[in-house]
C-alpha cells in the first residue's frame, strides 16, 4: 500500500477465531478521526491485498476500513488440502465468520458502519443483512453474485450435476470448467477493464501461494446456488431494513445482472446504478468509470451520515452521462405502484 496512507493511519493485520473455531486473517486501516467504518466483504478467489486501491480511496475520504479474508481464501483457514480450490459447506459459514469478526474486532457504537461487498461477497453480505438487519447502517453491493453464470450449462442442470457430485463424494473436486492456478496471464478474459490493475493483481497472485486460490469445487458451486436462491426469497428480502446501493457492470460475465432487479423489487430502500463499459470488477475499470463509481458511492454514504433515515424516492429511471464516455443508468427504489415498471426494465438490462 502507498506509504502516505500507512503514515496517516493505523494499519493492523491479525487473526480472529471464525465460527468453526479456526483462524481467519484480517486487515484494518484506521485513519485519525474516522467519519465511519467500512467493512469490505470480498469476492470469489480474492484476498485482502487485492483491495489496496479500494482501501486507499476509502481512506482518502476518512473511512476506517476493515477487511477480513473469508474462510478458504488468502491466509485464512482452509477446509480443503489443495489451496487452489475453493470449498465451503454452506454460505452460512461465511456469514457466521463475518458476524464473529464484526463482534470481536469492530466497536460498532463508536460510529456508523457501512458494508462494501463485491461479487460472492455480495451474496454473503445480502444473507448477512437478512439475518442481522441492524448491524450495518447502509450497504454498497458491487456486481453482487445474486445469480451465478454457469456458462453454456443451464443453472438447473449445473445445480443437479453439483448435487450429484457431492452425493457421490466428489464435493472437493473441481466443478466443470474450473481449474487450479496455472501462472499464465489472461487479461482478455479477466474481470478487469484496467490492464494496469490486472497486472498488479496477477503479480501478487503469482508471487504468493496463499493468493493462488483459483477454482471452485462442486460443493462451493452447490452452496453458491443454494445461497442465491435463499437470499432472493421474498420473505428474506423483506428483512433488509437499511439503504442499499447496487453497482452493476455492463460487461459482466460472472454474475446474472437480471437477479439484481429481483432484489430491487423485493427490498424497499435499494437503488441500482449501471456502469457502462465496465467488466465485473468495477473498481478495476477504466478511470472514467471509476470516477463515476466512487463519486456515486461516497455521495450515497455521505447521505446516510447526514440523515438518520435516508429513503430515495426520486425518479424511477434516470440517465446520466460522464465525460461523454461513460453512461450510467440509475434505477431508484421502487414503490408498490411501480413494480410493473421495474419488471419492464428487466428487458433493458
Question: Could you say what each language-model-derived stretch is?
Answer:
Residues 86-104:
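Alpha/beta-hydrolase active-site loop
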Residues 57-81:
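Conserved alpha/beta-hydrolase
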Residues 276-335, 346-349:
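Catalytic active-site module of serine/aspartate enzymes centered on a nucleophile-bearing elbow/loop
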Residues 43-46:
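Active-site glycine-rich loops that stabilize anionic/oxyanionic intermediates
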Residues 240, 246-248:
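Short beta-strand/loop motif that positions the catalytic acidic residue
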Residues 242, 256-264:
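Short alpha-helix in the alpha/beta-hydrolase fold that links the catalytic acid
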Residues 125-211:
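Alpha/beta-hydrolase-fold enzymes
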Residues 1-30:
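N-terminal cap/lid segment of alpha/beta-hydrolase-fold proteins
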Amino acid at each position: 500500500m502507498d506509504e502516505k496512507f500507512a503514515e496517516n493511519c493505523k494499519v493492523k493485520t491479525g487473526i480472529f477465531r471464525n465460527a468453526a473455531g479456526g483462524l481467519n486473517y484480517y486487515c484494518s486501516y484506521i485513519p485519525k478521526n474516522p467519519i465511519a467504518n467500512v467493512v469490505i466483504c470480498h469476492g470469489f478467489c480474492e484476498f485482502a491485498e487485492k483491495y489496496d486501491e479500494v482501501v486507499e480511496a476509502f481512506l482518502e475520504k476518512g473511512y476506517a476500513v476493515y477487511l477480513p479474508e473469508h474462510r478458504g481464501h488468502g491466509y485464512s483457514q482452509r477446509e480443503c488440502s489443495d489451496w487452489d480450490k475453493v470449498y465451503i459447506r454452506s454460505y452460512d459459514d461465511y456469514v457466521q465468520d463475518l458476524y464473529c469478526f464484526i463482534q470481536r474486532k469492530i466497536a460498532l457504537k463508536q460510529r456508523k458502519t457501512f458494508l462494501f461487498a463485491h461479487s460472492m461477497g455480495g451474496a454473503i453480505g445480502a444473507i448477512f443483512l437478512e439475518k442481522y438487519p441492524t448491524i450495518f447502517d447502509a450497504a454498497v453491493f458491487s456486481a453482487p453474485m445474486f445469480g451465478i453464470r454457469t456458462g453454456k450449462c443451464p443453472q438447473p442442470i449445473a445445480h443437479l450435476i453439483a448435487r450429484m457430485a457431492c452425493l457421490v463424494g466428489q464435493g472437493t473436486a473441481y466443478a466443470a470448467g474450473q481449474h487450479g492456478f496455472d501462472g499464465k496471464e489472461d487479461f482478455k478474459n479477466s474481470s478487469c477493464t484496467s490492464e494496469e490493475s490486472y497486472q498488479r493483481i496477477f503479480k501478487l497472485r503469482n508471487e504468493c501461494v496463499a493468493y493462488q486460490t483459483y477454482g471452485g469445487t462442486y460443493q462451493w458451486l452447490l452452496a453458491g446456488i443454494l445461497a442465491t436462491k435463499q437470499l432472493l426469497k421474498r420473505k428474506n428480502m423483506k428483512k433488509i431494513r437499511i439503504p442499499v446501493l447496487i453497482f452493476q457492470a455492463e460487461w459482466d460475465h460472472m454474475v446474472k445482472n437480471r437477479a439484481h432487479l429481483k432484489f430491487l423489487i423485493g427490498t424497499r430502500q435499494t437503488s441500482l446504478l449501471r456502469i457502462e463499459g465496465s467488466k465485473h470488477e468495477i473498481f478495476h475499470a477504466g478511470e472514467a468509470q471509476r470516477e463515476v463509481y466512487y463519486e456515486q458511492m461516497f455521495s450515497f454514504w455521505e447521505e446516510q451520515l447526514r440523515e438518520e433515515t435516508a429513503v430515495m424516492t426520486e425518479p424511477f429511471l434516470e440517465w446520466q452521462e460522464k465525460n461523454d464516455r461513460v453512461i450510467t443508468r440509475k434505477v431508484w427504489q421502487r414503490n408498490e405502484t411501480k413494480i410493473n415498471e421495474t419488471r419492464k426494465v428487466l428487458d433493458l438490462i
